[in-house]
Amino acid sequence: MKAMIFAAGLGTRLKPLTDHTPKALLPINGKPMLEHVILKLKDAGFNQIAINIHHLGEQIIDFLQANNNFGIEIFVSDERDYLLDTGGGIKHAESFLQGDEPFLIHNADILSNIDLRKLYEHHLETNPLATLLVSKRKTSRYLLFDKENKLCGWRNRETGEVKSFYPYFEPNQYKEFAFSGIHVLSPKIFDWMEEWTGKFSIINFYLSICAKTNIHAYDAENLRLLDIGKPESLALAEQWLKEEI
C-alpha cells in the first residue's frame, strides 16, 4: 500500500522554531511530527511512502537514513529547487505513486485519531476518484458537498468568495465540511492532471473537475484532529499524545 506525506512546508507560522529545523522535524512528545505520521501509516499497513521535501530538506533525508527508513520503502520527492504546492507535489511523485492501487495523502503536520486503514478500505468500496477526510470543525474556508457527499464547491466564510464549476451554484444549498489534509486518491487522478503543470493546489484541481467526476467526503464519527501549524498547537499536541499514552 502506497502513501505520500507532505513534508515540504516552510513552517512560516512556526517561526523562529523553523528557522533552522524543517517543520516536519519539530518534536512532539519526544518524536518529530514526521515520525508520528510515518508510524501511523506503517501501523495501518502502508509500506511504500513518498515524502516531499523543500525547506531544509537535507535534514529530513538525514533523519530518514538515521532511522533506516523505519523498515519500509521510502521515496524522497525532491522539491528543494521549487515548491510545487499540494497538487504539483502529488504530480511530481507520479513515478512512485502510479500503479493499480489507490494511495493515501497525509500532511506531516496533522495529528488525528482516524483509522487510516478504514478510510482506505472505504475508498476501495465506494471507488470515487478521490475520498477526502472531512469534519464539521469551525474554520473560515469550507468545501461544499451535496446530499450524496459529492464535492460541488468551496466557500470562504470571511470574504464571501465562492468557487464552483456548476452553473447557477447556490452555496447555501450544500453541506459545509472542513478538509483535514488526509485523502485517498485513485491512480486515475494522473490522467485528469495531464494538462496541469508546475505549482498548483490540489483543492483547486478538485474543484475544477468535481462536476465531471466523483470527489467524495468521508465524515468519520468522533474524529479528533489537530493541525499543528502554530506554536500554541504544539503544546496541544504534546498534551494529546500524553493522554493517548
Where are these regions (language model features)?
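Catalytic-core segments of class I nucleotidyltransferases/pyrophosphorylases
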Residues: E101-H106, L111, R117-L124, R137-K138, ...
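Glycine-rich N-terminal loop/short-helix segment of MobA-like nucleotidyltransferase
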Residues: M1-N29, K42-A44, D219
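Phosphate- and divalent-cation-binding pockets in alpha/beta enzyme and binding domains
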Residues: R13, Q59-D62, T86, H92, ...
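Conserved beta-strand segments of alpha/beta enzyme cores
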Residues: A24, E73-F75, L129, K150, ...
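A short, conserved acidic/glycine-rich loop-to-beta-strand motif
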Residues: T126-K136, R141
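Conserved N-terminal catalytic core of the sugar/cofactor nucleotidyltransferase
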Residues: K2-I5, K31-N107, K118, W196-T197
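Short beta-strand-to-turn element immediately C-terminal to the catalytic PLP-Schiff-base lysine
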Residues: L144-D146
